[in-house]
Regions:
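...captures the hydrophobic TM-helix bundle architecture rather than a specific catalytic motif
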Residues: 1-212, 218
Length: 218
């Protein structure tokens, strides 16, 4: 499962390539790059799923949780830090298959549906960013990474909804979607900070439940 990092890196590099150099590419070239990259991501997702579900299980018959990649981004204390990595469990592995497969179908369909549209290359760049954001969300090793990629999902959704930026209706819809979700995201962020403060970590399991004490409500 050493290649799982490519599941995130490939669409990210596709986003950079199409976003920066897309204007010098033909529609066919840009669409082919985006689609082939997602094809590779889909294959890697299925390979990862096969390897994961073929691996030995725990004594109680459950699947183990694997973290093939994880590094500390911003350290605060010994246990409290922002990490970026990849966590594999049955849910995240199945979601890799769902996201990559659906995204590949969207890329293939868009190749003909968006044919001749102005900004075709930009559209495929946004699709790559959207896919990378969703993939990063489901394999997050901690709640802060989940929040980070959730915000990227919101940004890429805003860009895709407002793709036809010359149409007032598209601009209005993109702004509405972006602003409304930001209110909920603020609550999400506050909850994460409270969790980190009282739990001593941004991981999905507090360092010690015995030390997880909440203030008394009077």
């Amino acid at each position: 499962m050493e290649l799982t990092i490519l599941i995130l890196l490939l669409p990210f590099f596709s986003f950079l390539l199409l976003g920066i150099g897309g204007k010098w590419m033909s529609h066919r070239t840009a669409g082919a790059i985006g689609t082939l990259v997602l094809g590779a991501v889909t294959v890697l997702s299925y390979v990862t799923a096969f390897q994961y579900f073929s691996a030995p299980r725990l004594e109680d018959g459950t699947f183990t949780t694997l973290i093939p990649y994880n590094f500390t981004w911003l350290p605060f204390t010994e246990t409290l830090h922002f990490d970026l990595g990849i966590l594999l469990d049955p849910i995240s592995v199945m979601m890799l298959i769902v996201i990559s497969t659906v995204s590949l179908m969207v890329h293939i369909y868009s190749f003909g549906y968006m044919k001749g549209e102005i900004g075709f290359q930009r559209y495929y760049a946004f699709l790559s960013l959207f896919t990378m954001s969703m993939l990063g969300l489901v394999v997050a090793t901690n709640i802060f990474q989940m929040y980070l990629f959730w915000e990227l999902v919101g940004v890429s959704s805003y860009l895709l909804i407002g793709f036809y930026y010359t149409k007032p209706a598209a601009i209005s819809a993109s702004k509405k979607a972006f602003i409304v979700t930001r209110f909920a995201d603020l609550g999400f962020l506050i909850g994460i900070l409270i969790y980190g403060y009282y739990g001593g970590t941004f991981g999905f399991t507090p360092v010690s439940y015995t030390h997880l004490t909440l203030p008394t409500i009077r």
